[in-house]
Each structure stands twice: as structure tokens, then as C-alpha cells.
UniProtKB/Swiss-Prot annotation:
Ranges where the record places region Interaction with TNFRSF1A: 2-400
Upper classification of the organism: Eukaryota, Metazoa, Chordata, Craniata, Vertebrata
Protein name per UniProt: Short transient receptor potential channel 4-associated protein
Source taxon at top rank: Eukaryota
Species per Swiss-Prot/TrEMBL record: Mus musculus
Record flagged with keyword NAD: no
Entry-linked SUPFAM superfamilies: ARM repeat
Cross-referenced InterPro entries: ARM-type_fold, TRPC4AP
Assembly description: Component of the DCX(TRPC4AP) E3 ubiquitin ligase complex, at least composed of CUL4A, DDB1, TRPC4AP/TRUSS and RBX1. Interacts with MYC. Constitutively associated with TNFRSF1A. Directly interacts with TRADD, TRAF2, CHUK, IKBKB and IKBKG. Interacts with TRPC1, TRPC4 and TRPC5.
Cited function: Substrate-recognition component of a DCX (DDB1-CUL4-X-box) E3 ubiquitin-protein ligase complex required for cell cycle control. The DCX(TRPC4AP) complex specifically mediates the polyubiquitination and subsequent degradation of MYC as part of the DesCEND (destruction via C-end degrons) pathway. The DesCEND (destruction via C-end degrons) pathway recognizes a C-degron located at the extreme C terminus of target proteins, leading to their ubiquitination and degradation.
Annotated GO MF terms: phosphatase binding; ubiquitin-like ligase-substrate adaptor activity
Amino acid sequence: MAAAPAAAGAGASRGRRLAATAAAWGGWGGRPRPGNILLQLRQGQLTGRGLVRAVQFTETFLTERDKLSKWSGIPQLLLKLYATSHLHSDFVECQSILKEISPLLSMEAMAFVTEDRKFTQEATYPNTYIFDLFGGVDLLVEILMRPTISIRGQKLKISDEMSKDCLSILYNTCVCTEGVTKRLAEKNDFVIFLFTLMTSKKTFLQTATLIEDILGVKKEMIRLDEVPNLSSLVSNFDQQQLANFCRILAVTISEMDTGNDDKHTLLAKNAQQKKSLSLGPSAAEINQAALLSIPGFVERLCKLATRKVSESTGTASFLQELEEWYTWLDNALVLDALMRVANEESEHNQAPTVFPSLGTSEEGGLPHTSARAQLPQSMKIMHEIMYKLEVLYVLCVLLMGRQRNQVHRMIAEFKLIPGLNNLFDKLIWRKHSASALVLHGHNQNCDCSPDITLKIQFLRLLQSFSDHHENKYLLLNNQELNELSAISLKANIPEVEAVLNTDRSLVCDGKRGLLTRLLQVMKKEPAESSFRFWQARAVESFLRGTTSYADQMFLLKRGLLEHILYCIVDSECKSRDVLQSYFDLLGELMKFNVDAFKRFNKYINTDAKFQVFLKQINSSLVDSNMLVRCVTLSLDRFENQVDMKVAEVLSECRLLAYISQVPTQMSFLFRLINIIHVQTLTQENVSCLNTSLVILMLARRKERLPLYLRLLQRMEHSKKYPGFLLNNFHNLLRFWQQHYLHKDKDSTCLENSSCISFSYWKETVSILLNPDRQSPSALVSYIEEPYMDIDRDFTEE
């Protein structure tokens, strides 16, 4: 009788197990309901409660269910993996199980990447999905992190081969199963730990690619100073590893973009800057500083960026060979693996197992003998292109960061610019046919093509390098620098100090400097080319800052002005981005330069051409206002000069005559103020506000400011909306004070580009915002009382 309670307890326990089993099989002991287990596992994955792992089922149960659901035996394999991967395991059997799991997932991943849906449709549920649902991802994370656990003072170890298998399986699961990458990204300790796996060459490629994918979806940017022994880790990378590492760095040193257009407004940016000042440096800034503190880091990047590729393979065979391999180029890791097969024959059996095609021919992939025979110079060139675009991106971001001057000095010292000049024709802007390779799933004009991306990244780097920095003259060679000096001497003006201070040992060598090479390809670029925008931006950055007559003449002598006018007028360019970049460049090229206006008038030599030009200007003032500003400033200077050459240009130039008319200036002024509002101001359109201020500052110099304000008031009334324009302008000027009085760089740029002291800018704004309604130069004097709305709060918290 004493045993009865125990028996009853045992029966109750057995009943609970049966009930649980019945629930798992669909709530009763009969035939299982399809999908019910997977649903419960999915709920458990989301909540952390209930069914979450294969170990919660018996092997018999899983085997029976597998017959119906076709799970490829993955849950049973996971059950064995749990049993053989405990802390005291020797991991021998564990590794053999991983070898069984890997091909089940890798074939699926290959089908996913190559968009071969036929393979995945054969199973009810993808293998990667089943693997994750039964707890495979979490288990592999635990296995990989075993070395962080100590038992009796000794840290556990797992082999590189086993780590490699785990990483490949994780990567394939991330590729095929939605949400896995994000879950891994939330495990910050795991993400940091992954960096330590890059110390081994055997696991480097798999680790780097997995980290890259994880960081791409991580909500908060990782801090590199939390990576153990970062300096030692990076310093020990060989050049190939460092180039791969740049793919990761691209994510860690760039400020995160919210993707919300509203966040790009200057109001939001100013609010964010105030917040950042209280919080200290951003994670991206901390990461940049961490990298720059690593000895030799920038020097090694410069060497990578300028490393040459053997030219033993001709262009035609290069393209033909690449077309046979295009499906592999979607994934940089696959490309690295192929390179490894080609270059390290002795290691071909250890090629990364992200996809089985890199394994044996029996698995339906490339036989090693075929890979070694067919992986030619073409793949090496593409490999180098993909490396260089990542390296150039990192250098570009560092050039725009807080340590800009430090990076500039190092880039100059390590001869990045002359090195890129030597690569320009053979790699960066090499000739290729219309059948050039594009990535799988893209077209020839897609900016994702490695060739195209490299060109754009190269142009962005030149833009960042030249922008408002004296080192821009390193883009020239010695002969071209001498030409600048000769231009100054002939014009009887002082030679540019930065030219005199340029270290001639660091400039470009050869017959042409990098700037001249860029001009040559720019003039040959097809009308519809997307490169036109970036080329114009790069050349314009060379002219930015204090206006240099010698710099302008250097470019004018090479036919740049005629090329720009051809694109604007004769080709009737339709792209707004390209038009804006060409108008900006034209403005910098012509500003204060009498010779440029003479050339302009010679090219635009008919009323018909001039009307086409005006139509392009007036079609979008956001795009053309910088040119309007430069012409207005030039007109003001020319009118105050006593020179026959200047007088001749003033009397003959259609453009100067057009801008000199007060109705023209008022039309521009009215539209410039009307197309912007405080809430919509961005870095792109704030120039409209500054151009309107330039027009009014020049009017103030001539004591005509009240006249211009009175004319604006009349134009308001003619539109039947009294007060709407001047109220808006008042708010814009209030914002201007908040924005520019706290940004030294912006104020310096305004001063240098206009040759008007910033104190005069500030005075003019203060006069316009004067609250005294009796002041003839105050905006409020021209807003009637019933329509006044000047105290609106436009700040964003």
C-alpha cells in the first residue's frame, strides 16, 4: 500500500509526458498534424518558452516525423550534436556530425544565391529553416564560444576545422533563413568574439563574411575598441586579409543612416549635432580613431590601393573568362575561395565550404583540376578590383572624418595619389567592350558592377582629397605644376602659396597627372553615363575654396568650359544630378575670370543657344543657383574694375548682360526664397538661401537694399499672397543665424567662395532681422501687420 502513492506519481508523470507527446503530434495519439510541431517551435523561438530545441524530443519521435515531413534527418543530427558537444567532449564525433549537416545546407544556399528555386521546392521546408527551428543556430554559437569557458583554470579548445564548419553552416543559414542574421546581431558578446576567430588563416574568410553580414543588420554600431587586441589582430593580417577586413570596416566607420529623409534636413542634423555634443564622439568616430592608432594601418591601405596587377592577360580573354564565372561574383567569399583554389594547390582539399561547389566535383561543383586550369589572370584582376574599391572606401571615409588632416598627411606621405595615377589606364579606367561583365541579377548600367563601383569610389576619393585642401596639387605632375607657375607669372599675379609649398617628390609622375587624366576621360564620357556626375564633382572639388586664377586657366586651356557647355546646351542633358554638378563646376570655373566669360560668349554665340542655356538654368534653381551666385559675384567685381578687357566682356557677354538687369535679379531672388522653407532645408538646397543673401548683400553695398525689399513686397502682392514670402524669408534668416554662427567650417566656406567677409554676411542678416519697423532695411517694415508671422518656432527637439 505504501507504494501506491509512488505508483500514482509515476503514472501522473507518465501521463504528462504522453500529453506533451500528444500535443506535439497534434493534440492526440493518432496521426500527427502537419506543421504543428514547427509552429510550436517557432513560437518557442520567439518567446523563449516551450519547445525550442531538438533535445526536447526523442530520436524515435523525430525519425518517425521525418518520414512524413522530409526534414532530411536534420533534427536527429542536431540531437546527436547536442549529445557530443558537451563541455567534457573531445569533439571528434561532433565534427563528423557537422560534416553531415554542412552539405545539406550548403547546396540549398547555393540554390538560393543563384536563384535556382527548383532545388528548394523539392522539400516542404528548407533545410536551413529546419536547422534553425530545432535550435541549430544557438547550438553552433555555443560550440564556437566554448574557448571562452574555463574548466579548472584551463580554457576549452576546438579545432580550426571545426570552427570553419560551424561558421559555414551559420553563414548558409543566414543566407537562406530570414531573421537569423538579426538574431546573431543581437548577441553582442558573440559578435565581438567572432573577431578573435580572424587570427587564424583557416577560419578568416568564413569569419569575415559572417561578421560583414551581421554588422550590416545590427541596429547599434559595434565599437572596435572593445575587440580584444585589435591592434595586434590587424597588424598580423597579411595584405589579402587586410583587404577583406576593409569590407567589415566599411560598416564600422561610417555614420549609420536612418534611411528617413526627414533626418537629412538641416534642422534634424543640427538637433543631432547638439545631442552628439552632449554624448561625446559617435561609435563611428571612436572606431576611426581606433584604426588610426594602429601602427602602419594607413600605409598598408595605401599599398593595397596602389598595388599593381600583372598584365599578362589581354582584355579580350579577360572578359571572355569572366563571363564564365559571373554567377560566382555575387559573394566576395566565394571569389576568395576560388582564388585560394587557384593559388594554393596544396590546400585545395581545405577550400572554404560555404558552398559545396568549392568542394568536390561529385557534389555538382567545379572539379579542382578544372578550377586550377580555368581560374586565370582575369579572376586575379577582378579580385584586385573588389579589394581596391573596399580599401578606397575606407580611405575616403577617414579623409572625411575628424582626423582629416592627419589622414591627409599620411596619404600624401605614402604616395597614394601617384600610385593611383599609375593604375589609372590599366585598372581603374581601363578600356572594355560593351559586353563587359556584370554581376548576376544586375545589368550593365548597374552601379553594383565591381568595375563601375571602383570608378565611382575612385572619384569620391579624389573629391574628398581635393576638397578645400592644399594637397590637391599632388594630383598634378611636375610639368603641370610648372605650368601653374607660368600662368601666374604671365598674368602678373602672385604664385599660389600652396603650389610653392607642394613637395615635388610626392606629386604624380609620368606624362600626365591624375587631374589631367580625369579630364581626358570626362570629355569622352557618353551623354547618358552615370560617371558624369562623379567626374564633375571631383574636378569641382579641385576648384573649391579661395578662387585661383591659375587653377581656372589650367582647366580652361584643356577645353573644360566648352565640354560643360556642350553637355548643358547641345546634348540637352536631362539628368538633374548631372546638370547640378555641371552648373556647380561651371560656376567655379568662371567665377571672377574674364577669360572664362570670353570663352563662354564665344561658345554661346547665338540667341538660340543662349535661350537653351537659360531654359536649363530656370528649369531648376536648386540645381543652377550656384552658377547664378558666381555670375552675380563676378558681375559685381567686373563693374568695379577699370580695365579694357573687362569692359569689353561686360559689353559683349550675353550672360553678364542678362544677370545685370534688376528684373532678372528680382526674379531669381523671389524664386530662390520661395522654393525653400526651414523645415525642408537640406545640405543640397541651403545654397538657395545663401545665393539670395549674396544678391541682397551686393544690393546693400550699392545702397539698394530697401529697393530690393520693396520690389519683393510688390511681387508678393501681385501673387495675391501678401506676407507669405517675407515671413518665410524671415524664418529662414533666423535659422541661418542658428546654423552658421556655430559652424566654423561652413562660415569659412561662405567667405572663401564669395570673397565677402563673414562679418558682412552676419551684419546683413542682422539688418534684415532688425525688429524696428521704421528701419528701411528691415524685413518687418515690408510685412503688413495683419499678415505678420515671424515668431514661429521651427526648432526640432
